[in-house]
């Protein structure tokens, strides 16, 4: 069965979610979080290579159709075995690498607060990957293996960082320097803020100062504060 108009990835995911009787069942069978599925359906993120393979296996579609929308949705007896399909997916990924694109682990399930703080429970593994130009990474002076991608939630860093902006974070840059922007964690809360060392602790400073005053962390709490990494690039939506 051909789906000639299924050339939009969010539409294909929407179709497969419906095919499995809704997001909850889709999440249960694929092992993907509901928040990640929501981002796929909205077109805010793309699945990793391993998730593409898992979705194809669970839903009975080919990886080619899932990735491109240009071939038959239903598998047939004339199709090559699954191993060949997986090989093709790896070949396409290799082609991207040869073209100067690196795939960087992303954490769409982590709620990074550009506000007053967020709660994230037990989230430590990446749930996707995002492509970044090697030329851009070189210009930023960072290495793909040291980076991860997160998304901002809130308006405290306006106008520098908008709500839902994609942030490239260098996880190797944990030393506080100047008024640079960092991802910081205190317990289960993760913020994106400017970080300033004070004589009695640390101040987390928002760019939207009128609505979000500095957060002072002192004493033992300051010692427990962890610098996840420095934000080195921000991706704004134009719509």
From Swiss-Prot:
It holds the Pfam family HTH_3. Residues 24-43 bind DNA. One of its GO terms (molecular function) is DNA binding. Residues 13-66 form the HTH cro/C1-type domain. Keywords: DNA-binding, Transcription, Transcription regulation. InterPro entries: Cro/C1-type_HTH (IPR001387), Lambda_DNA-bd_dom_sf (IPR010982), LexA-like (IPR039418), LexA/Signal_pep-like_sf (IPR036286), Peptidase_S24_S26A/B/C (IPR015927). It comes from the Bacteria. The keyword Acetylation does not apply. PROSITE patterns: HTH_CROC1 (PS50943). PANTHER family: FELS-1 PROPHAGE TRANSCRIPTIONAL REGULATOR, PTHR40661. This is Uncharacterized HTH-type transcriptional regulator HI_1476. It comes from Haemophilus influenzae (strain ATCC 51907 / DSM 11121 / KW20 / Rd).
């Amino acid at each position: 069965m051909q789906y000639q108009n299924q050339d939009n990835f969010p539409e294909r995911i929407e179709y497969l979610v419906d095919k499995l009787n809704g997001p909850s069942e889709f999440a249960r069978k694929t092992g993907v979080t509901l928040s990640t599925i929501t981002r796929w359906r909205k077109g805010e993120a793309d699945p990793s290579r391993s998730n593409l393979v898992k979705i194809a296996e669970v839903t009975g579609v080919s990886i080619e159709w899932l990735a491109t929308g240009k071939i038959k949705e239903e598998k047939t007896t004339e199709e090559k075995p699954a191993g060949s399909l997986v090989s093709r997916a790896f070949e396409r990924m290799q082609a991207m690498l040869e073209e100067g694109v690196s795939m960087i682990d992303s954490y769409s399930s982590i709620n990074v607060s550009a506000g007053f703080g967020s709660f994230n429970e037990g989230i430590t593994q990446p749930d996707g990957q995002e492509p970044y130009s090697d030329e851009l990474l070189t210009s930023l002076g960072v290495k793909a293996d040291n980076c991860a991608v997160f998304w901002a939630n809130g308006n405290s860093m306006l106008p520098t960082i908008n709500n839902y902006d994609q942030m490239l974070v260098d996880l190797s840059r944990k030393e506080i320097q100047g008024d640079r922007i960092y991802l910081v964690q205190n317990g289960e809360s993760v913020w994106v803020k400017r970080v300033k060392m004070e004589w009695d602790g640390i101040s987390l400073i928002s760019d939207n100062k009128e609505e979000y005053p500095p957060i002072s962390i002192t004493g033992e709490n300051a010692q427990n504060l962890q610098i996840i990494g420095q934000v080195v690039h921000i991706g704004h939506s134009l719509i």
